[in-house]
Amino acid sequence: MTAALRGLYAITDTPLLAGGKLLPYAEAALIGGARLLQYRDKSGDAVRRLDEAQALAELCQRHGATLIINDDLELAAHLGVGLHLGQTDGSLAAARARLGADVVIGGTCHAQLELAERAVAEGASYIAFGRFFNSNTKPGAPAATVELLDQARTRFAQPIVAIGGVTLDNAPGLIARGASMVAVIHALFAADSALEVQDRARAFAALFD
């Protein structure tokens, strides 16, 4: 279950990918080498979210990547794909029981090893720490340090995701300190074209070679 949990973890952003960019930009990230793709949409438009998630699931299957749904157990269960839960998004243990042993489920742990311990105990496939740098998506999130990665790497067998303001410039330091994956939104998708997204994804993926 965790063999492929290494490399670029692309996360979508609805406002950033408005105007028909979602699918072409997501596919560009996958072509460039993203191993995980998280569909993150906080709107209440259930019909659109289902349509978009289904389309993304097909893209991930085509490119050998894993789709993760943010904070929607029902949608993840309906599509048979992965799930990411924040601290207020419901029980990870319940999600594991619902989705089964083989589905990838991740948990947000902010900057706290104790939260990671709980996530692991409840069946998390990976543990996500951050924000490590200033983040456009969650500017008020608690800050994490690279020392936290050192501690997490020695304490947990699960893959570690670093998130929050990650760029091509600062990602190598996170990887060197134990990040199995770097989760990227703006540094990947705030681009003028799908080709630019593909080039950025390829550059991020190369950091793990």
Curated annotation (Swiss-Prot):
Residues annotated to bind Mg(2+): 71, 89
Q: Which GO terms describe its molecular function?
A: magnesium ion binding; thiamine-phosphate diphosphorylase activity
Q: Which organism is it from?
A: Ectopseudomonas mendocina (strain ymp) (Pseudomonas mendocina)
InterPro entries from the UniProt entry: Aldolase_TIM, ThiamineP_synth_sf, ThiamineP_synth_TenI, TMP_synthase
Q: What is this protein called?
A: Thiamine-phosphate synthase
The family assignment reads: Belongs to the thiamine-phosphate synthase family.
According to the record, how does the cofactor bind? Binds 1 Mg(2+) ion per subunit.
Which residues of this UniProt protein bind 2-[(2R,5Z)-2-carboxy-4-methylthiazol-5(2H)-ylidene]ethyl phosphate? 135-137, 165
A GO BP term here is: thiamine diphosphate biosynthetic process
Recite the UniProt keywords alphabetically.
Magnesium, Metal-binding, Thiamine biosynthesis, Transferase
Enzyme Commission numbers on file: 2.5.1.3
Pathway assignment reads: Cofactor biosynthesis; thiamine diphosphate biosynthesis; thiamine phosphate from 4-amino-2-methyl-5-diphosphomethylpyrimidine and 4-methyl-5-(2-phosphoethyl)-thiazole: step 1/1
Q: Which cofactor does it need?
A: Mg(2+)
